[in-house]
Amino acid sequence: LPRMTSTPSTTTHISQSECNTAQDCGMRWFAQWYLGLRHAGPEGPPARVGSLGHACLGAHVLALADPETFSGPPDFYAAMLTEARKRHYLAADADWCDASQDLLDHANLAHRAAHTLITSPEFDVRRPVVLDGRPLVEQRLHATWEQLARGAGLVLPDALRRALAPHRLGMEGTPDVVHYGNAAVADIDAPVYLDDYKMRTRPVDGTPADNVVADPQGAFYKMLLAALGADGNGRREVVFRQVNVYAGRWMTLEDFIDPGSPYVVSSGLPTRDEKRMPGMVRAEVWREAWRVLEERRRIATADNPKGPRLPTTSEYHEANRFIEDLSYRKAVQVSRWRLDHTVCLEVVRDMLAAVAMRLAQVDAGITPGRHLRTWKQAPCVRPFGCDVSSPCLASLGSNNAEATLREHLGAGRFRLDVLPAVGDHDDAPEAP
């Protein structure tokens, strides 16, 4: 079983994560957000790289917000060391010299990804929004139901309010960065940008450049900003942006031309199948690999009676098309959503209704049912696809799920070792 944590249900505000879990599977919501079970096993490489990359980003933006405190560029490795200690990658008194090679590799990938992001023309963070004297850089925000109704216009129907009020005081969230872009703070017509950064260890392709459908995460955070007045009390437009940053390794020429390379196909040329590649490859690297391998093949077949094997017209065409495709790939890709306030109100009400439904079931003595998914790579069948899959599937049905979960807890299979969320700060500002 994966190592778990268990604490009494101390959730006081609804988060976007709780809404997503409530919509996805009642049993998982029941285990995580009502019984308080949390997965606390070691994080995988993507999660580690993402956490360390966010630490670098936060250090950079905070330096922009307070240039008098930072006389020079921020120390990314110092920021990552603090994050590594907080998330228990390292002991509280450990240093980088005590880190494993895997952790050092992850830190190097995160450092490179942060540098790629900051130097990208897509990165326009210059002036973060300041709330209660603090820049909104990975700061946890809380808003009560009264603030949401008064500032955001999020007035809950009576049935929804009766289900939520006894259990939840309001909403909470931790936006990555909220900023004004290149505009001056005094420019009231300038929009507020709500950025969510994803550090991807695998290539990301086909990310839409713009989307008119309200994103649930953006809608949720927009309600928080409106309730706390961070959007100029409704005078500023809020634009939600998801920024995908490639944080994996880049393939080199040697990856293709080394003897026995697995990235060379039977024709002797470099593969164009990106699923076989361990990372992204730049167009100029693949072009040079194709040239070297083609020349190597031609020399190796020079003694053939029919002459050396030369590239065919089809091989030339496919290579040029792939090179052109690679030239359009970006290490930083941005998706934009313009958040219409009326639409966002409906989206967030639906999200809150999912949590209210689960709470009402528990209040009525009904254990929320499981949502079993059995297709290939589904969370219920994929190894480590769900944090509570083992005790959930060990039960004989939803009716005795609580007993099964508590039995696992009583046997000591769930341990208390709570990890903080990415970017959480203990001294984050709360709504007054």
Where are these regions (language model features)?
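RecB-family 4Fe-4S metal-dependent nuclease core
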Residues: 1-432
